[in-house]
Amino acid sequence: MNAPAPSSIRRTKKLPPLRVGIGGPVGSGKTTLLEMLCKAMRDRYDLVAITNDIYTKEDQRLLTVAGALPEERIMGVETGGCPHTAIREDASINLEAVDRMLARFPDADIVFIESGGDNLAATFSPELSDLTIYVIDVAGGEKIPRKGGPGITKSDLLVINKTDLAPLVGANLDVMASDTRKMRGERPYVMTNLKALDGVADVIAFIEKKGLLTV
């Protein structure tokens, strides 16, 4: 990972909670990443999570069953339409969800917001998210990073997940890393195998440094 330089400014309780948006295509590993982050960070930070699905609250259920956080700290949002719209053009349903969660948990340090599965053009409204993490996966093919799109080129952190599948799909991780650097410039990225927890610590380090969290 090409990590950002640490900041001398530290986030305190006087600052609003950090809002971290997690986006990416269906099946890339967004919910798994959110689960791993919650489990790894919940003993140090006060966390709440909001998930987006079009017609169900399946991701909320999955996180609850996995024990990522207590049930009352996970809210599911049914967007009823394009998942991109609910995090960008009209984020009101998610902004309302954030307000409701912070009314319940006013001391929250981090609000995680997982978008519904979307395409490479998905981005979060700056009103909704302070940091954006975009998740793609190796199973989508070696070419994915060079396809571009705001999720790949403009997200604060790009996560390339399921590195363990590279031999099975004929993907060269070195090529993917090179293409990622060409598309993102100095913006950081992390290669992960979330099921084995590989790379999770790097994602957490990014959130803590870039999000000005006290540690």
From Swiss-Prot:
GO terms for molecular function: GTP binding; GTPase activity; nickel cation binding. It comes from Burkholderia cenocepacia (strain HI2424). InterPro entries: CobW/HypB/UreG_nucleotide-bd, P-loop_NTPase, UreG. The gene is ureG. This is Urease accessory protein UreG. It is found in: Cytoplasm. It holds the Pfam family cobW. It comes from the Bacteria. GTP binds at residues 24-31. Keywords: Chaperone, Cytoplasm, GTP-binding, Nickel insertion, Nucleotide-binding. SUPFAM superfamilies: P-loop containing nucleoside triphosphate hydrolases (SSF52540). Belongs to the SIMIBI class G3E GTPase family. UreG subfamily. Facilitates the functional incorporation of the urease nickel metallocenter. This process requires GTP hydrolysis, probably effectuated by UreG. GO terms for biological process: urea catabolic process. PANTHER family: UREASE ACCESSORY PROTEIN G. Homodimer. UreD, UreF and UreG form a complex that acts as a GTP-hydrolysis-dependent molecular chaperone, activating the urease apoprotein by helping to assemble the nickel containing metallocenter of UreC. The UreE protein probably delivers the nickel. Its main location: cytoplasm. Gene3D superfamilies: P-loop containing nucleotide triphosphate hydrolases. One of its GO terms (cellular component) is cytoplasm.
